[in-house]
Amino acid sequence: MTASYLPSILVPLVGLVFPAITLASLFIYIEQDEIV
């Protein structure tokens, strides 16, 4: 019921969110490093 369609939502969500967080944190780190 809920568990049957939950993976089909979580898999692309995790696959998109984690790279986005990684790129965002890396971008912020590089920007702060260049400013200082």
Curated annotation (Swiss-Prot):
UniProt entry keywords in alphabetical sequence: Chloroplast, Membrane, Photosynthesis, Photosystem I, Plastid, Thylakoid, Transmembrane, Transmembrane helix
Q: Pfam families under this entry?
A: PSI_8
Q: Which organism is it from?
A: Anthoceros angustus
GO terms in the biological process aspect are: photosynthesis
Annotated NCBIfam families: PRK11877.1, PS_I_psaI
| Keyword Cell cycle applies | no
Q: What is this protein called?
A: Photosystem I reaction center subunit VIII
For this chain, the family text in UniProt reads: Belongs to the PsaI family.
Query: What membrane topology does the UniProt entry give?
Result: Single-pass membrane protein
* Compartments it resides in: Plastid, Chloroplast thylakoid membrane
